[in-house]
UniProtKB/Swiss-Prot annotation:
Its cofactor is Ca(2+); Zn(2+). Residues 1-28 form the signal peptide. This is Phospholipase C. It comes from Clostridium perfringens (strain ATCC 13124 / DSM 756 / JCM 1290 / NCIMB 6125 / NCTC 8237 / Type A). GO terms for cellular component: extracellular region. Zn(2+) 2 binds at residues 164, 176, 180.
Length: 398
């Protein structure tokens, strides 16, 4: 929030130094706002690979949903590049990084970073946007669902690069931007058209084995990220040759395309079969995705909280306070809440609420537009609010 002025200024100074050291934005793979570039190539090829690899015994429902996805291909491409242009994004793209060995982005692992650490990572963003995509798909909102799926695949592509899973930023190395440019200029020669097998063979069948979506997604991403990180140290740093970089781009871009095909395959099976990733599972964390109204002065600098009450009468409440400015007019903010009781099921939670508390005597009102709560990879609450919340107030969302 804005009241965190000191560390916000530190973060701004870091952002300034980062931009000063790079001639372009700090992307992992390149992507243009119009849905072109390396990220768009990856998702386009991912769909093409899956189509080429479909075995004859794939269910008709999966084939039908693949056709719907293809009809919305431009939305997939737009979603795949959007996170690099999102006005709500962190200035240093902290949530586009994820070290598969530490489970952190560079805001926790890199010694030069002195501002508030960012809890979101490239890996957690994959799961969040995948959950939103499944939710909208199951409601028949295919265009929005495909855009969300594209966003998920953007982050998947990011953590497959050599630099992002190694938590090497443009502050750490000029190679970050140079390698991205190198790959973008040669991306056509790195396209692949198959994962090397049909969907009734091991690579694809293994993808469907673990019904726990969150656990599967994290470990699936980890495998590809580990390859990317390893390639950074063996072939993609500034000390390596152009031939090394060519090898690094070839391997990691092929992995991005193959991995994307596999992830989309899992998505299509989940929506085709109506799989519920939350059934019978304990809830260890809740993810809130809050949209603030675009109406003038809808944002707030007051303290904001999220709380729950379980059927046994116990309550838990968290402050919602991301580094930098959140709850701004038109913003979309994400918060992750760890539950004290890890034995809870989602049905054990009786009530949920958001609460506003004055920061000063002269409080400003706040107008949230919508809040979605995600548990175990499923949207469990979708609440349209569109009401002004004034003073010290509580708004029940469940």
């Amino acid at each position: 929030m804005k009241r965190k002025i000191c560390k916000a200024l530190i973060c701004a100074a870091l952002a300034t130094s980062l931009w000063a050291g790079a001639s372009t934005k700090v992307y992992a793979w390149d992507g243009k706002i119009d849905g072109t570039g390396t990220h768009a190539m990856i998702v386009t090829q991912g769909v093409s690979i899956l189509e080429n690899d479909l075995s004859k015994n794939e269910p008709e429902s999966v084939r039908k949903n693949l056709e719907i996805l293809k009809e919305n291909m431009h939305e997939l491409q737009l979603g795949s590049t959007y996170p690099d242009y999102d006005k709500n994004a962190y200035d240093l793209y902290q949530d586009h990084f994820w070290d598969p060995d530490t489970d952190n982005n560079f805001s926790k692992d890199n010694s030069w970073y002195l501002a508030y650490s960012i809890p979101d990572t490239g890996e957690s963003q994959i799961r969040k946007f995948s959950a939103l995509a499944r939710y909208e798909w199951q409601r028949g909102n295919y265009k929005q669902a495909t855009f969300y799926l594209g966003e998920a695949m953007h982050y998947f592509g990011d953590i497959d690069t050599p630099y992002h899973p190694a938590n090497v930023t443009a502050v750490d190395s000029a190679g970050h931007v140079k390698f991205e440019t190198f790959a973008e200029e040669r991306k056509e020669q790195y396209k692949i058209n198959t994962a090397g097998c049909k969907t009734n063979e091991a690579f694809y069948t293994d993808i469907l084995k673990n019904k726990d979506f969150n656990a599967w997604s994290k470990e699936y991403a980890r495998g590809f990220a580990k390859t990317g990180k390893s390639i950074y140290y063996s072939h993609a740093s500034m000390s390596h040759s152009w031939d090394d970089w060519d090898y690094a781009a070839k391997v990691t871009l092929a992995n991005s395309q193959k991995g994307t095909a596999g992830y989309i395959y899992r998505f299509l099976h989940d929506v085709s079969e109506g799989n519920d990733p939350s059934v019978g599972k304990n809830v260890k964390e809740l993810v809130a995705y809050i949209s603030t109204s675009g109406e003038k002065d809808a944002g707030t600098d007051d303290y904001m909280y999220f709380g729950i009450k379980t059927k046994d009468g116990k309550t838990q409440e968290w402050e919602m306070d991301n580094p930098g400015n959140d709850f701004m007019t038109g913003s979309k903010d994400t918060y992750t809440f760890k539950l004290k009781d890890e034995n809870l099921k989602i049905d054990d939670i009786q009530n949920m609420w958001i609460r506003k508390r004055k920061y000063t005597a002269f409080s400003d009102a706040y107008k949230p537009e919508n809040i979605k709560i995600i548990a175990n990879g499923k949207v469990v609450v979708d609440k349209d609010i569109n009401e002004w919340i004034s003073g010290n107030s509580t708004y029940n969302i469940k």
